Amino acid sequence: MSAPGQPPDPLTGHGSDVLAFDIGGANLKAADERGRVWAEGFELWRRADELGPRLAALAAGRPRRIVATMTGEIADCYPDRAAGVAGIVTALLHAARSIDAELGIYRLDGRIVSAEEALSAPLSVAASNWHALARLAAARADSDRALLVDVGSTTTDIVLLDRRGPRSLATDDAGRMASGELVYTGIERTPVAAIVRSLPLAGRRRAVAAETFARSQDAWLLLGGLPEDPASHDTADGGPATRDAARTRLARMTLLEPAEVGQDDAVAAAVHVADRQARLVAAAIRRVLASHGIQPDRVVLSGHGGALASMALARAGLDLPRLRLEEAIGPAAARAAPAVALALVATGGIP
């Protein structure tokens, strides 16, 4: 994977038969059937008009077929999900027509359908990437009682699996959030104020501001759950993704000056944030398993939030064999796992 603007894009070379896109609200991911992947930040709510041209650029290698899954339809640049699906499908049609490729959209029932069919039933293709990912996880787990825990930048998916795929309690976002299968917390983008009401800083417990001065990313940077990346400015304040900058952002959450908060203080605050987040995910895990009445025999970990997933599993009391998807398919592919899964589905690589 490369950062946007660093040519050549790895997918623009000729030779791909299928190019799969996973279009989120904050990230754009792609994979082809040869295992090449691409992931970049793409703030859809700010750049919806740029989506079609960007997809066309990534498809410049002229694959015969483009397939797509999405979660970006919920972005608040769209009045509702149906409009979001229409906007994303229109952008995909722009890309497909620019290279005379077929276009297929992934449905929540596991089928890949035409753009016309997707537009006629937009909610059947909304928020569908988790389903494709669960099929890949099920194929790798080879168990009738596996549990998928996928922690991404924004959300966490908790899905019971059998050998055929997901055994979900619900399929749409609202139903999945009500069942506990979708937890709107992630390792990077969740505002600290949405996780805790106070932080232990500078010798006392302090209330936090109801502002997005810091995100979960800052806690996990300080704890080593995310690597430092001084070149990345995809942070709450646009500063670098470093531990020292994370310390400053956490200090700001309690309206303290950065000089008043040492590194040890900041780490203690980060532990509190991480623990609260892990408790939230652990409660959802217990709820999903209780609803199914089944105890899993193994766990599949997906996404780049493995540190949060591991802490949550410990909180939930699940000491089980674990399959890390990044070890099974490689770290780059794991970061774009729904797109990788969809490319495999489209070519018959997984059932």
Task: Set out the residue ranges of the language-model regions.
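Conserved Rossmann-like nucleotide-cofactor binding loop
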Residues: 26, 154
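Nucleotide/phosphate-binding catalytic cleft detector across ATP-hydrolyzing
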Residues: 1-25, 31, 35-148, 159-351
